């Protein structure tokens, strides 16, 4: 199985071409064809030597993904189900925001973090995506825009799809460098957010990278007992370790951290828990932000339900009175398989039923 050429940063592409007797400008031409003209095959690169095109074809594919399902919401949200070369399925979501077009990408096939409310973890991690497979998600959404010929572009990226990004650290960092490259897609670092469930040692590594990419932490509980019961990762990285890493990140980068907090009815949404959350974030208040997220119910996790609006607002009021920067997240795609992992799970179930029916 040939790797995608999207797996290479521009410097890596230059080094690869030079090793094969090409001038540096040849790699720059290839890069422009990929990310500015956004061709889907090497044969479309008309200023590349005909002798070199077969070498490219022997070494790489361009886009390794195949589109399986597309769902479009009334609010303009688009959910894609892509098939990888090995037949595995991943999800990508396009969200139309007032500030631009944001794409949520997947970094792993399945997830081992084990959050008890999440559709992503219904299927255990089968493998990491390589950086080319992550970049390809952006490229296919951008192709959707290019085909419409309305001058639209992917302006923001959130690494919050299926999988734990920091459990696939090397490939995610390569992906970030590719999409941020000023000579390519040029998606600004401050328009990119990486979300982690709380791998404290990787938060420290990320702080040391010197990138301007935003960091979000999936918190979802204000104390260790509750967080360990709904997020298995907390048993390895309890709040003390997590917040030590977050404080290091803030000190090192002087950048704000966003805390994601899914509102689960009568689980983590009481007034007492709101005060606990305010107290937990007190020392980093100036450089932190809490995002309260309405829960998208998952049939396999029917022990959880969405917090009623009045409980969300009461929780929000406690945070605001304590000086916490917070917002209730606007919902997208509520009329399609909105929860991360739902579309993939449903499609895999249908595929299994088809196989069973033909036996």
From Swiss-Prot:
Q: Give the UniProt family note.
A: Belongs to the radical SAM superfamily. RlmN family.
Q: Which UniProt keywords apply?
A: 4Fe-4S, Cytoplasm, Disulfide bond, Iron, Iron-sulfur, Metal-binding, Methyltransferase, rRNA processing, S-adenosyl-L-methionine, Transferase, tRNA processing
Q: Which InterPro entries match?
A: Aldolase_TIM (IPR013785), Methyltransferase_A (IPR040072), RlmN_N (IPR048641), RNA_MTrfase_RlmN (IPR027492), rRNA_lsu_MTrfase_RlmN/Cfr (IPR004383), rSAM (IPR007197)
Q: How is the cofactor bound?
A: Binds 1 [4Fe-4S] cluster. The cluster is coordinated with 3 cysteines and an exchangeable S-adenosyl-L-methionine.
Q: Which residues form the active site?
A: 91 (proton acceptor), 340 (s-methylcysteine intermediate)
Isomerase: present as a keyword of the record?
A: no
Cofactor(s) this protein cannot do without: [4Fe-4S] cluster
Q: What does this protein do?
A: Specifically methylates position 2 of adenine 2503 in 23S rRNA and position 2 of adenine 37 in tRNAs.
Protein name per its UniProtKB record: Probable dual-specificity RNA methyltransferase RlmN
Q: Where does the secretion signal sit in this chain?
A: none
Query: What organism is the protein native to?
Result: Streptococcus pyogenes serotype M18 (strain MGAS8232)
PROSITE patterns in UniProt:
RADICAL_SAM
Gene designation per UniProt: rlmN
| Molecular function as annotated in GO | 4 iron, 4 sulfur cluster binding; metal ion binding; rRNA (adenine(2503)-C2-)-methyltransferase activity; rRNA binding; tRNA (adenine(37)-C2)-methyltransferase activity; tRNA binding
Q: What is its main location?
A: cytoplasm
Q: Which NCBIfam families does the protein's record reference? A: rRNA_mod_RlmN
GO terms for biological process? Answer: rRNA base methylation; tRNA methylation
Quote the CDD domains the UniProt record gives. Answer: Radical_SAM
Q: What is its EC number?
A: 2.1.1.192
Compartment(s): Cytoplasm
The reaction(s) this protein catalyses: adenosine(2503) in 23S rRNA + 2 reduced [2Fe-2S]-[ferredoxin] + 2 S-adenosyl-L-methionine = 2-methyladenosine(2503) in 23S rRNA + 5'-deoxyadenosine + L-methionine + 2 oxidized [2Fe-2S]-[ferredoxin] + S-adenosyl-L-homocysteine; adenosine(37) in tRNA + 2 reduced [2Fe-2S]-[ferredoxin] + 2 S-adenosyl-L-methionine = 2-methyladenosine(37) in tRNA + 5'-deoxyadenosine + L-methionine + 2 oxidized [2Fe-2S]-[ferredoxin] + S-adenosyl-L-homocysteine
Q: Where is the Radical SAM core domain?
A: 97-329
GO cellular component terms?
cytoplasm
């Amino acid at each position: 199985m040939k790797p995608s050429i999207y797996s290479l940063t521009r410097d890596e592409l230059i080094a690869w071409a030079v090793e094969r007797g090409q001038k540096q400008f040849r790699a720059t031409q290839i890069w422009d064809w990929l990310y500015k003209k956004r061709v889907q095959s090497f044969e479309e690169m008309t200023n590349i030597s005909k002798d070199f095109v077969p070498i490219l074809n022997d070494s790489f594919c361009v886009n390794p993904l195949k589109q399986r399902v597309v769902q479009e919401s009334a609010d303009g949200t688009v959910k894609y189900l892509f098939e990888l070369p090995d037949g595995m399925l991943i999800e990508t979501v396009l969200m139309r925001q007032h500030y631009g077009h944001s794409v949520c990408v997947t970094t792993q096939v399945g997830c081992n973090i084990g959050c008890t409310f999440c559709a992503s973890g219904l299927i255990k991690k089968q493998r990491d995506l390589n950086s080319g497979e992550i970049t390809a998600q952006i490229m296919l959404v951008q192709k959707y825009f290019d085909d419409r010929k309305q001058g639209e572009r992917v302006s923001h990226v959130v690494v919050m799809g299926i999988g734990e990004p920091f459990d696939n650290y090397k490939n995610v960092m390569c992906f970030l460098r590719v999409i941020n490259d000023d000579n390519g897609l040029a998606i600004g670092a401050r328009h990119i957010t990486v979300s982690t469930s709380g791998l404290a040692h990787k938060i420290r590594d990320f702080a040391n990278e010197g990138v301007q990419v935003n960091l979000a932490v999936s918190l979802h509980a204000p104390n260790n007992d509750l967080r360990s019961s709904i997020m298995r990762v907390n048993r390895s990285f309890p709040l003390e370790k997590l917040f030590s890493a977050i404080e290091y990140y803030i000190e090192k980068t002087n950048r704000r951290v966003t805390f994601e907090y899914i509102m689960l009815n009568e689980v983590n949404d009481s007034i007492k828990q709101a005060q606990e959350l305010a107290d937990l974030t007190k020392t980093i208040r100036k450089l932190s932000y809490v995002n309260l997220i309405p829960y998208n119910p998952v049939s396999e996790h029917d022990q959880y339900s969405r917090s009623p609006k009045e409980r969300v607002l009461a929780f929000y009021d406690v945070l605001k009175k304590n000086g916490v920067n917070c917002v209730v997240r606007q919902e997208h795609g509520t009329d399609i398989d909105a929860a991360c992992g739902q579309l993939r799970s449903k499609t895999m179930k249908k595929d299994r039923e088809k196989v069973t029916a033909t036996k």
